[in-house]
Amino acid sequence: MSEVSSAPVRRPFHRRRKTCPFSGANAPRIDYKDVRLLQRYISERGKIVPSRITAVSQKKQRELAQAIKRARFLGLLPYVVA
């Protein structure tokens, strides 16, 4: 006969989703000239950090990526940090 362990079953940990830092009343605007804001969403190697890490909404992530690319094109941000 097989005996089943009667250990309590643990539910998987569910992390609460963070809110988007660009939504809300006094949220900062995404602007390609605001280099200090854009640098918070770029890794130390110069890559754009994904929204699952920064908790930015899908719409704002696209705006953020476009602003970072514009700033790179104008020479305000580096493409790659060596």
From Swiss-Prot:
GO molecular function annotations of the record: small ribosomal subunit rRNA binding; structural constituent of ribosome
PROSITE patterns documented for this protein: RIBOSOMAL_S18 (PS00057)
Top-level taxon: Bacteria
SUPFAM superfamilies xref list: Ribosomal protein S18
Entry's Gene Ontology cellular component terms: cytosolic small ribosomal subunit
Entry keyword DNA damage: no
Gene Ontology BP terms: translation
Database matches in Pfam families: Ribosomal_S18
Annotated Gene3D superfamilies: Ribosomal protein S18 (4.10.640.10)
Key words of the record: Ribonucleoprotein, Ribosomal protein, RNA-binding, rRNA-binding
Oligomer and partners: Part of the 30S ribosomal subunit. Forms a tight heterodimer with protein bS6.
Cited function: Binds as a heterodimer with protein bS6 to the central domain of the 16S rRNA, where it helps stabilize the platform of the 30S subunit.
Family membership noted in the UniProt record: Belongs to the bacterial ribosomal protein bS18 family.
Annotated NCBIfam families: S18
The name this protein goes by in its record: Small ribosomal subunit protein bS18
Gene name as annotated: rpsR
